[in-house]
A protein has these predicted regions:
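Phosphate/nucleotide-binding beta-alpha loop and adjacent structural elements of enzyme active sites
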Residues: 1-149
């Protein structure tokens, strides 16, 4: 809806599959269908499933299904998308997996800015990964960080 309201339908590609660190089938969980409150997660590791299940609202209409996930590097290799100059990562917990799945992009980018919503339990790991790939934190506010190269 936002794409149409902002007249971006010729400039935006909607890919409804989840991003992760590789090309894999796994479970996608969602327990809230209010806009901005999806609380959705593509679960790749078993211990992630246990942790995520604790946060599910027991009265919710929890749904899950098996779906294909892929990495940003997969999409770039297959020429599904062009190299971005600006990216936003706001995915309810798979930030680290998405970053790991974008290693080629991040290592080889000359110019790139990323706005990322950070979870406290992965903040240090995300910082280490992005720093190793040559990005520098330029702004830190609330649960969001901006990194650039």
């Amino acid at each position: 809806k936002n794409v149409m309201l902002n007249f971006l339908h010729n400039n935006v590609k909607i890919i409804s599959n989840p991003l992760c660190n590789n090309f894999t089938f796994s479970k996608f969980y969602q327990n809230d269908f209010l806009p901005g409150e999806a609380k959705a997660r593509f679960i790749i590791k078993k211990n992630d499933l246990e942790e995520f299940s604790k946060n599910f609202n027991q009265k919710s209409n929890e749904v899950f299904y098996n779906t294909l996930g892929f990495s940003l590097d997969n999409l770039l290799e297959k020429k599904v998308i062009n190299k971005p100059d600006l990216s936003k990562i706001d995915v309810d917990g798979n930030e680290l997996e998405i970053i790991k799945g974008a290693r080629n992009l991040l290592n080889n980018a000359n110019k790139l800015t990323i706005l990322i919503e950070i979870r406290h339990d992965t903040k240090n790991q995300i910082s280490e990964e992005l720093t190793k790939m040559g990005l520098h934190k330029i702004l830190d506010f609330s649960d969001n960080e901006i990194w650039a190269k």
